[in-house]
Amino acid sequence: MLFRSQRRAALVAMQQLREFEPRLVGPVLSGTATQHSEVQLHLFADCAESVALKLIDHGIAHEVTERRVRMSPERVLAYPGLRFAIDDQAIDVTVFPMDGIRQAPVSPVDGRPMRRANTVEVEALLEGEPAPFSEDT
């Protein structure tokens, strides 16, 4: 179950970074992910360094990046980002300012505000998914 393992990795990352109000976005949330899709998270912090320090506290190696995000049809902004892995699953984080939680970027698919799921919503998605088939039963 591809989505299940990707969403579980997302949930682990979201729980470890809970103080930054994480939101799952993109193909893993929408159900269109492939085995090569990264888990995409939006975090909210005064500075990206605080997120990096939290990853260091958890012993998670990471890479600092920058992400260009379309906030409206005519406005593209650059935000700091981080890349790391949880259980061999690539995680791509974009760090927005604290007030960024109120305005989602526009979706590259349909131009509407991007759907975001908080930890509770991701847990509910996982509960609604069938368990992987086990040959032991």
What is each model feature region?
Residues 95-137:
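Catalytic cores of NTP-dependent nucleotidyl/adenyl transfer enzymes across multiple folds
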Residues 49-51, 92, 101-103:
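Residue-level signal for secondary-structure boundary sites
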Residues 27-28, 83, 100, 124:
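Residue-level preference for alpha-helix termini and adjacent loops
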Residues 61-98:
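Conserved catalytic core of two-metal-ion nucleotidyltransferases
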Residues 49-67:
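Hydrophobic-cavity lipid-handling domains and compact docking modules
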Residues 10-55:
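Active-site nucleotide-donor binding segment shared across nucleotidyl transfer reactions
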